[in-house]
Amino acid sequence: SAPKGSTIGISYIGYKSQDIINQGQSNLIVVLQEDTEVLDEIVVIGYGTVKKDDATGSVTAIKPDKMNRGLTTTATDMINGKIAGVNITTDGGAPGSGASIRIRGGSSLSASNNPLIVIDGLPIDNDGIKGVSNPLSTINPNDIATFTVLKDASATAIYGSRASNGVILITTKKGEKGSRPRVTYDGNVSISTKTKSIDVMGADEYRNFVTDRFGAESSAVKLLGKENTDWQKEIFRTAVGTDHNITVSGGLNNMPYRVSIGYTNQNGILKTSKFERYTGSVNLAPSFFEDHLNINFNAKGMISNNRFADTGAIGAAIAFDPTQPVMNGNSKYGGYFAWENAGEFISIATKNPVAMLQQKKEEANSKNLVGNIQVDYKFHFLPELRANLNLGMDMATGTQDIYYPKESPLGYVDNGKTGYETIDKYNHL
């Protein structure tokens, strides 16, 4: 019924829009191309996708920006500072460390204020395991297609009371129907360093200060050493990190697929700290019966190894005597310098910061597997009526070890220390 010469606009969620000039034809056959890039008008709201203008709650959707993403060890780094009302505070800044996420501030003084995290339709347990305190650390940032944040109380209508602090919905990348097999590699190298040091006295300044304050013949002056040690320089380093990802994607008949593996190795600027992660993901999305039956299978696995540095070494480096050496050959403490009085270790004295890092070994190893299968069926006699089934699991195990020998300033009094702890969790949907 459109008049001749008029322009007909055709659009659909997930496809490129087309404008067609009516030449007077009685019938038009229009084929829309899939558009996986333009997602500004589409948001995921828990039970499907809608246009942003049709969403009734407070919703923010973003896509990861490869051109301006910075150093992204975890998924948390990708949204930090990019969504209004979402505040992220990292726990110490070590590679792979946890983070506190708050959507529109905290709502409880005693209960949890953590938002609910949903990955490909599967709610994830917010309780971390040994080695991975942040559930967003378990997913490879390279696999993420979109973030959607539900900020207000309307999210509780979908997910219940768990969503009272907001919801972070993560949609991972998928293959494209009918596309040819494609293999891609994405890699980067990063360098991290501290920008400045805490201003403290150098060795000569400290000697002059002690001499002027207590006198040249005082016992305090006799305790001074002959070295010139920059303790902050001894514990910090320029850290190098690498990230590698290989992806195979395509569409086999009516079954789009995507398989990816990733490896991340990030050293911390505090010596001995290190985060290493292996990830793998599989997505299959076959459709049957002229797209009336759609199946979406997702599986993501992660293995991480984390070496924790003793952050107490930072305070010790600021306070330690710069005239003392890092090592003095004392076998009682593994060769490291330590304060003594008449040959006895002074337990209340500031400990050697380098020894705190090198002689304390605290490591965590964790494994995580998240998977779900969604089955969606549109009835032939009434396409608006759908049956949807979502089955999923979230399994994780984490082990943390701590050890320092008795021949160390840390372990001299306690005759050394060793510890071991394991946490397992299993959740089914």
PLM region spans:
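Small-side-chain secondary-structure face that scaffolds active or pore-lining regions
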Residues: G178, G268-S281, N296-M302, F308-A313, ...
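Outer-membrane beta-barrel transmembrane strands
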Residues: R237-M255, I261-T264, S347-I402, E421-L429
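Short coil/turn segments at secondary-structure junctions
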Residues: I62, Q232, M356-K360, G416-Y420
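Glycine/serine-rich loop-strand microenvironments at binding/catalytic pocket rims
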Residues: E290-I295, A316-N365, K378-D394, Q400-N415
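Short, small/polar-rich motifs associated with maturation and membrane association
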Residues: S1-M302, D310, V370-G371
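A surface-exposed, glycine/aromatic-enriched loop/edge motif typical of exported proteins
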Residues: T193, S197-I198, A203-F214, M302-E344, ...
